[in-house]
Amino acid sequence: MMVAALLAASLAFGPEDAAFAEKATREFVETCTPRDAGTIRGGIAANWILDRASMTGADVRRDVFQAMTPKGMRRFVNLYAEFPTNPTSRWVVLVSHYDTKPDTGCPGANDGGSTTGLLISLANVISEWREQHGNVMLVWTDGEECMGERYSPDDGFQGSQRAVRYLQEKKRQVQAVLCLDMLGDADLSISVPANGDATLAKIAQHAARRIGEKGLVKPMKDAVKDDHVAFMDAGYRAIALIDFDYGPGNAWWHTPEDTCEKLSRDSYLKAGRLVCEMLGILL
């Protein structure tokens, strides 16, 4: 119990980390929008993430692959930042997609942008304490968004499906997969979709209480199609942590209204503290 408490205390996400995440998101959105999957702009976004992740001291890998889409074969890029500490320990995997929804004019500041910046900031925090925690992997996935109106077997989640194969090929023993999505909303309310691991959902709520944010995380009655589904289908324990109430009636989602002005440093702080608390519990 004492070791777990020390781990939770060491992985602290503070106001300066929230400010860093907010700044990183703004720079990412301003520099790399649009960043639709399978496009040149998407490749530019991947390079931007690679550069920032490489500065954290992680073992960084770029995974370029091709996958079928409704528009034919397309080139996708996943990024992995690994913090290995103990070869016998299991891994906790944090996931964020970075691509934008095609043909919508959506800048993806919250949807794809906010958690891209958050993961980079979390990488800095994890790097500082890497000798005191278990194995952590951060994954930025391409191709989460579908090109059409609805997801289909060859439209959407190409990046998360590829990440599953990466974990299998590398024989990573995984404790949990936490998929982060749309967590910069100034009016932050984090939901856990019903089609996720029930134990991880309870851990998320417990972690929220431990950081003094009892009502921050709420279970959903409905299932949501997000990156966590690919990991669940492969037998991994996974959940999505998502704010699916972005604007009145979720009106800003996948629209030109998804801008950095809708985001809040305080929301980054809450989300970052929640994730670090969950890492402290899981590791």
Please give the residue ranges for each predicted region.
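Hydrophobic alpha-helical targeting segments used for export or membrane insertion
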Residues: V3-A12
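N-terminal capping segment at the start of a domain
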Residues: L11-I44, T56, D99-T100, L180, ...
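A non-catalytic alpha/beta surface segment that caps or lines the substrate-entry region
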Residues: K23-P84
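Sec-exported extracytoplasmic/periplasmic mature domains
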Residues: R26-P34, L50, S54-A58, S121-E131, ...
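Active-site-adjacent substrate-binding region
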Residues: P34-A37, R62, A176, D185-L283
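Structural recognition of the beta-strand scaffold that forms the well-ordered cores
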Residues: R62, Y80, W91-V95, M137-W140, ...
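Acidic/histidine-rich catalytic neighborhood of metal-dependent amide-processing enzymes
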Residues: R75, P102-A207, I211, G215, ...
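Proline/glycine-enriched tight loop/beta-turn segments at coil->beta junctions
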Residues: T85-W91
